[in-house]
């Protein structure tokens, strides 16, 4: 009597057994949408254009990733985002947003992150990491404790050691006045960003994103609201964007040629759209400047600009006109200007598959969702169902919806 040999094949290159995922979760197997079509950036192909945006978890001790980070990312990657980007991860200890933020400022941080990337790769998924520095917004407490309070020394904070382009606090009377970064400090910062990028490569990430948005350090350099420097890193547009361009060059030089490099920016501080705030802040970061910056980033080896907005000042939130896809039009303006020279992704209020498909059909290359993935790790499948197409999840999940394999035939004696 002969029997067919049917094997639950193992994923290749993984230190433990787990079934191979062929094709990967997130692959469109029936129907046709642009949202679930593949996107190739340099040497990496993403199965679809719905990405997981970075979501800070405020759950680390001394910068080290743990099981919370593994399960947070793991439950989502099993269900197939095109790319999962890990949260803002500090390039310097004083660059953490809170004492509980992730870090890549020490070699010891690599191994816990490798555990997460190995799991993602066991699922044939792509995973990136966002490298960040909070600047004057550092030493905060977790947002569920307070929307603006600082973490004091007694709870591991460093309110006396926060840094910024200029001695201007995020919120007068709430945040400490930051120390001004010297030219020497900026040189160290650039080196530390490059070192963190090298550690990200050693941790086996597939892509790197540089965080220059939401009022954190690099955005603080970009915006005249927070940058009053008189040296080569302040004043003119060319000077204010200099540090970001230099960091992009440093990072691009130390990562593999085939690795995608992303940059997240705030397209605007929002003050340009409010007459009262324009009077209070006559100079701010604007969409027009973001368009100029995007073209310069393309020349520095950046592959994709992830377009968000706001965060530079407590009053930024007052001006924001929220709603479905409330900042997508900024991404569309930038994409129209850069054309095929640069990939652009949109984020913010993209809550439905129909809206996500509409955005990519408009010419945007990818969309990102954050909180909606956190609420529903199966967002990829939910959007696919809404659009009437079939997209795979991990085999262990998918079969319970798609049915068992073919039954074995009785053998002849």
From Swiss-Prot:
Presence of the UniProt keyword NADP in the record: yes
Regions annotated as coiled coil: none
Induction cue: Expression is induced by the developmental and secondary metabolism regulator veA.
Disulfide pattern: none
Pfam families, per database record: Oxidored_FMN
Binding site for substrate: 58, 211-214
Reactions catalysed according to its record: A + NADPH + H(+) = AH2 + NADP(+)
EC number from the UniProt entry: 1.6.99.1
Keyword annotations from UniProtKB, A to Z: Flavoprotein, FMN, NADP, Oxidoreductase
Function: NADPH dehydrogenase; part of the gene cluster that mediates the biosynthesis of aflavarin, a bicoumarin that exhibits anti-insectan activity against the fungivorous beetle C.hemipterus.
Record-given protein name: NADPH dehydrogenase afvA
Organism per entry: Aspergillus flavus (strain ATCC 200026 / FGSC A1120 / IAM 13836 / NRRL 3357 / JCM 12722 / SRRC 167)
